[in-house]
């Protein structure tokens, strides 16, 4: 089963807001701040329409928390861990929905695109969902496009063969639940 769930949008928008305030973070530095703030446990719904438009993400997270009586993040690290934990919980909810609809138990989550490079999020996802997380290519869209063209041109016989070739073309990481 395939379902796209909001990914790093919220965190990227926070970074953009912080940049305008003179606080620039490279992702490894921000993930370290998040890791250091792991005791902060407030969760938000990353798929809430409030978070869809660009701009002012930290303020919108504050509003979301205030409206629901939740403890709002105070530090940039708390914002980051709040978002990452919330994403992992959103993935867990989505897995339950997919399992209910399909009648199948999902045993592995495949993370593609930019999120595949976020080891903290991937480990949180494995821990919170209680299943293995396997990363795929950062440029998943590109690989998919190449696969379709290769099948159309007769270079590969079918999708199974294309997937096997793609899997040999990148290094995957596997995250086990704690």
Language-model segment annotations:
Residues 114:
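Glycine-rich Rossmann-fold phosphate-binding loop(s) that bind the pyrophosphate
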Residues 1-108, 117-141, 147-177:
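Active-site core segments that coordinate phosphate-bearing ligands/cofactors
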